[in-house]
Amino acid sequence: GDSELVRIYYGTLRLGINLHEATPGWIKAEKDSVVVRLPPVKLLDNDFIDEARTTSFFESGTWTGQDRDVLYQRACRTMLHRCLTPQNVSIAEQNARDQFRKLMLSIGYEKVSIQFEKTDRRGNKK
């Protein structure tokens, strides 16, 4: 007979910067000016699916762990495709820019320049 398995996956993808990946000299200050060169925005955690909230919506037949893993991997790819958009990366960059600008102004710098390292389409630094 026909076997069916429908699972609902929940997750939170967090986009941001990892300062551990900043290159040497990423922040340069001179008098009242500072230039901050941030690492590229990326997905901060690959374990974004909340397994505890995953539910089987409809299940009939017998399913192996491998079958469930295939569905899990498909859910991961779908979430990544929907969330890692140029628009969301741009929003995350703007948030990082705003936070660093506020921080540098509060420290006392008057002129603040925030830049991001460039990456290729796969997210590797150029």
Locate the predicted segments by residue.
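Domain-level marker for long, solvent-exposed, non-transmembrane regions
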Residues: 1-126
